Amino acid sequence: MSDHIRAASSPSRHGSEHGWQHAVTPQQRNRILVATWMFTLCFMILVMVMLGGATRLTGSGLSIMEWAPLMGTLPPTSQTEWERLYALYQKIPQYALVNHGFGLDGFKHIFWLEWTHRLWGRLIGLVLLLPLIFLAVTRRIERSLIPRLILIFVLGGLQGAVGWFMVASGFFPDSTAVSPYRLVVHLSFALLLYSALLWTALSVLNPEPRPLPGTVGLRRMSAVTLGLVCITIIAGGFVAGIHAGLDYNTFPLMDGRLVPEGYGEGHRAMFENIPTVQFDHRLLATLTALTALLTGLIGFRRGGNARRAVLPLMVAVILQYALGIATLLSVVAVPVAVVHQGMAVLLLTAAIVTLHSLRGAGRTASINAPASSH
């Protein structure tokens, strides 16, 4: 990502008899400002994903039964309000079947995490909307970018609605958790919003791709890697949704078998059968890691800018694979699992940055253009 920042902030050069004079143009300053705003939003979404993971892992997600985008901003301020919310929670199956009798103090414990998760979502909305208005009014955003940013804002609003749609599935009779399908949709919307912001920010910083002749194959491999990362994260969402990580806590075998007993049983085995869901996630993670490392090796052989483009991807995929194993062996210990979920976003980041850095694959530098440093 540093290459993109250097590209945006690289000064224009004006020849003079005394040497070079350096200046950053107003357009470059505006691009850096806009990109910094979008990178801030990306960081906030990363935190949001980790908060969501902690909320799910601690069973806190169903503690607030009301959808109040504005009035729900403030927490309860009186004993009467706490008791009212606790009485609502006592009506859902999760209380009766999982947390029966844990008292108002126990309810407060799970309430605060879900409330923080929702509050952070509201803050993301404000950080998205208010600077967007300011930057547009002061004409710091290039006009061609405004429709895309409005679409991103709409996507952010939809994500909030999808979040409630997911939570509501946990209020059904005999339900003690949210629907894994709705959980995956909620996660997918978050990552789609994150990816759109990140790609746009990188493009704002570096609107003209750097020529990288002879790297078309590397770009294709990086695109395949990004696709595999996305599919593997979605598969991980189903692992989380049906709590498949609580079984088969050995690696690399599953109860002493490469392919676990019961694999593929049921017409929705890919989404609801625990051995199938966990094995598929393991297989996809391994395929993703191998593809990313192969992409990295190709980039290293090319050297120069290609090597710099693939290095973050190689580091991220190794760390994420190790965290996945650690999460499994720890029987989904909450701190390890939350870091694993956050690292998935960082791996997605590395894959996007790598692909974006290779936009100039196959292009040759102009004769009059300054040679890029290697």
Swiss-Prot record:
Residues passing through the membrane, by range: 32-52, 118-138, 149-169, 184-204, 226-246, 283-300, 309-329, 332-352
Disulfide bonds: none
An annotated GO cellular component: plasma membrane
Chief location of this protein within or outside the cell: membrane
Pathways per UniProt: Porphyrin-containing compound metabolism; heme A biosynthesis; heme A from heme O: step 1/1
Residues involved in heme binding: 281, 340
A molecular function GO annotation: metal ion binding
Compartment(s) where it occurs, according to its Swiss-Prot or TrEMBL record: Cell membrane
Catalytic activity line of the entry: Fe(II)-heme o + 2 A + H2O = Fe(II)-heme a + 2 AH2
Source taxon at top rank: Bacteria
Segments for region (Disordered): 1-22
Obligatory cofactor(s): heme b
GO biological-process terms attached to the record: heme A biosynthetic process
Enzyme Commission no: 1.17.99.9
Keywords: Cell membrane, Heme biosynthesis, Iron, Membrane, Metal-binding, Oxidoreductase, Transmembrane, Transmembrane helix
HAMAP family, sorted: HemeA_synth_type2
Assembly, per entry: Interacts with CtaB.
Family label: Belongs to the COX15/CtaA family. Type 2 subfamily.
Its biological purpose: Catalyzes the conversion of heme O to heme A by two successive hydroxylations of the methyl group at C8. The first hydroxylation forms heme I, the second hydroxylation results in an unstable dihydroxymethyl group, which spontaneously dehydrates, resulting in the formyl group of heme A.
Name by which UniProt lists this protein: Heme A synthase
Native source organism of the sequence: Granulibacter bethesdensis (strain ATCC BAA-1260 / CGDNIH1)
Source taxonomy: Bacteria, Pseudomonadati, Pseudomonadota, Alphaproteobacteria, Acetobacterales
Gene: ctaA
